Amino acid sequence: MKFELQNQFVAPSIEFLKRLPLAGYQSIARTRLIKMLADKNDEIVGIQQDLIKEYAKKDDKGELIVKDNQYTFTPENETAFQKAYYELMIENGEIEKATYSHHKEDCQDFLLNADINVSGDEATCYDALCVALDVDFDKR
């Protein structure tokens, strides 16, 4: 299965999918989708760490400086970091993994028929996931 999803929705999609009450083949489809998203999330976290290493202040030994459990930045580097981080998060990430022949259709089905109330950020995440997986609400 292959689809694109904005990076900012990858981690929240995992949490959203975990909340869905599913059984049988739908649960299996969800678990495989979560694994795909988790792999993409690991990639995003790695890139975030690379950005921190590039822009955060370092001591004379080259170690990142952490103050009050936060990395420190010069004003210029903080602006550059925030810009790079924003660009990373709004980027459409390509997610692809061989699963099984009807995986996408199974995911579309459980998303279309999800019996869960959502609002706020979770609703935005649900919508992004439905768009990414081409869920057709006209079928309802």
Where are these regions (language model features)?
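N-terminal interaction modules that seed assembly of large macromolecular complexes
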Residues: K2-D60
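Low-complexity intrinsically disordered segments
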Residues: Q49-R140
